[in-house]
Curated annotation (Swiss-Prot):
Top-level EC class as recorded in UniProt: transferase
EC number: 2.7.1.33
Binding locations of ATP: 6-13, 99, 121-125, 137, 225
Gene: coaW
Subunit structure: Homodimer.
UniProt pathway: Cofactor biosynthesis; coenzyme A biosynthesis; CoA from (R)-pantothenate: step 1/5
Kinase recorded as keyword: yes
Main localization (coarse): cytoplasm
Any one biological process term the GO annotation gives: coenzyme A biosynthetic process
Protein name, per record: Type II pantothenate kinase
Gene Ontology terms, MF aspect: ATP binding; pantothenate kinase activity
GO cellular component entries: cytosol
Disulfide bridge positions per record: none
Length: 265
């Protein structure tokens, strides 16, 4: 059996290949000892690691794994997934939305990291808890899916009420900027969480398309564990990218790019 592992700050992503089949699974990083014990009880042909906690795993297992830089591993894995899913693009920006977000430019041969922001899954969970007292990520994102941002976020259409705006009316003028205009309203947890995810999605997209413009490409690829069970984040990112005139790509199993790429480096 061949195993690639991306041991991140929040999640451990695992890719297994055996008998020409591929399997994906995740574990919380808090369960890293469980992963170590599992590896020590498996017959493994190839083991390759990446991510911030790769060294922790390597120090406690009986095997001799190879360790790769996570940026290179993610780029290689993404290249494989793009090809398998029929996306033939030569150069693009990709945003890896994990606990935070890292941005990379791929020129058809090599990747280079071109930026990063602190908005990502960590902000969704942390700010989400402060707004709702919910700690479970799946419960939080499920509730956010039912939220309405219009009572909380100030949109361009709210400013230009009776006039045609010079830019699309659905663009956000100020995140959470509509709150003081609706103090007589009850702000539900669903609405607050939807707006929090909106902030994350719009910041990531704004950064991604700014870099895409700088590197002269229309293609922006989004991967990362923050999209797990988070259809709202995906919709915000894809819609905002299109609204700004760029072409978004959401990659199935993109969160496993690092683990898959490590396996093939």
């Amino acid at each position: 059996m061949k195993i690639g592992i991306d041991a991140g700050g929040t999640l451990i992503k695992i890719v297994q290949e055996h008998d020409n089949r591929r399997y994906y699974r995740t574990e919380l990083t808090t369960n890293i000892q469980k992963v170590i014990d599992w590896l020590n009880n498996e017959e493994i042909e190839t083991l390759k690691l990446t991510g911030g906690n790769a060294g922790v795993i390597a120090d406690q297992i009986h095997h001799s794994p190879e360790i790769f830089v996570e940026f290179d591993a993610s780029s290689k894995g993404l290249e494989i997934l793009l090809d398998e899913q029929g996306h033939q693009i030569e150069h693009y920006i990709f945003a890896n939305v994990g606990t935070g977000t890292s941005f990379h430019y791929f020129d058809g041969k090599d990747q280079q990291r071109v930026g990063g922001v602190g908005t990502g899954g960590g902000m969704i969970q942390g700010l989400g808890y402060l707004l709702s007292n919910i700690t479970d990520y799946k419960e939080l994102t499920n509730l956010a899916q039912n939220g309405d941002r219009d009572a909380i976020d100030l949109k361009v259409k709210h400013i230009y009420k009776d006039t045609e705006p010079p830019i699309p009316g659905d663009l956000t003028a100020a995140n959470f900027g509509n709150v003081l205009h609706h103090l007589d309203n009850q702000f539900t947890s669903a609405n607050k969480l939807a707006s929090a995810i909106g902030v994350v999605g719009e910041v990531i997209t704004t950064m991604a398309i700014t870099l895409a413009r700088e590197y002269k490409t229309k293609h922006v690829v989004y991967i990362g564990s923050s999209f797990n069970n988070n259809q709202l984040l995906r919709e915000v990112v894809e819609n905002y990218t299109v609204l700004r005139g760029f072409k978004p790509y959401y990659i199935e199993n993109g969160a496993f790019s690092g683990a898959l790429g490590a396996l093939y480096l």
